[in-house]
């Protein structure tokens, strides 16, 4: 199985701008990537990072500056083996959660995101393709079934939690056990409660 981790190296995580400046967002994105790669290492797979530009990393890196759909679909079309895609901003991903993803049966195994996205998948069907726009989990269910494939979904809080918005940083601080949580604390990002909900602030 080929395991791919897409990584936006150019201007990552712009929606975190209320909390982190551009340099900090780039640094934090790299830290989350490191956490995901560490978890994959523990599972025993050798991932390739699919980056939008060249990055200095002690891992195999493929540079593809096309939009995500085109880049991933190119890999799927060219592969003669199952392909797994795990997003680089899954700062809460653990080896156990990833092992469940990889071990699940089905032509297409999907890990839905909390906002309707698709945070990870395993494609064993040769005709499966991605469409990451809008509520992509619905599209990916349909695409898999239209191709004649069976679909399995992984119910995992840790795989469903991607980091896009400032509120997502609270989840990292509350539940993270890796470098991303440590990085946020070192940057002075703190938990706070506003309107009865836990969020973050940076005094």
From Swiss-Prot:
Question: Which keywords appear in this protein's UniProt record, sorted alphabetically?
Answer: GTP-binding, Nucleotide-binding, Nucleotidyltransferase, Transferase
A Pfam family found in this protein is CofC
Please indicate which superkingdom the organism of origin belongs to.
Answer: Archaea
Pathway(s) annotated for this protein in UniProt: Cofactor biosynthesis; coenzyme F420 biosynthesis
Q: Which reaction does it catalyse?
A: (2S)-2-phospholactate + GTP + H(+) = (2S)-lactyl-2-diphospho-5'-guanosine + diphosphate
Q: What InterPro entries does the database record attribute to this sequence?
A: CofC, Nucleotide-diphossugar_trans
- BP-aspect Gene Ontology terms: F420-0 metabolic process
Cell membrane as a keyword of this entry, yes or no, is: no
Q: What Gene Ontology terms describe what this protein does at the molecular function level?
A: GTP binding; phospholactate guanylyltransferase activity
User: Which EC number(s) are documented for this chain?
Assistant: 2.7.7.68
Function of this protein?
Guanylyltransferase that catalyzes the activation of (2S)-2-phospholactate (2-PL) as (2S)-lactyl-2-diphospho-5'-guanosine, via the condensation of 2-PL with GTP. It is involved in the biosynthesis of coenzyme F420, a hydride carrier cofactor.
Q: How does it assemble?
A: Homodimer.
Q: Report the sequence similarity comment from the record.
A: Belongs to the CofC family.
- What is this protein's record name? 2-phospho-L-lactate guanylyltransferase
List the source organism: Halomicrobium mukohataei (strain ATCC 700874 / DSM 12286 / JCM 9738 / NCIMB 13541) (Haloarcula mukohataei)
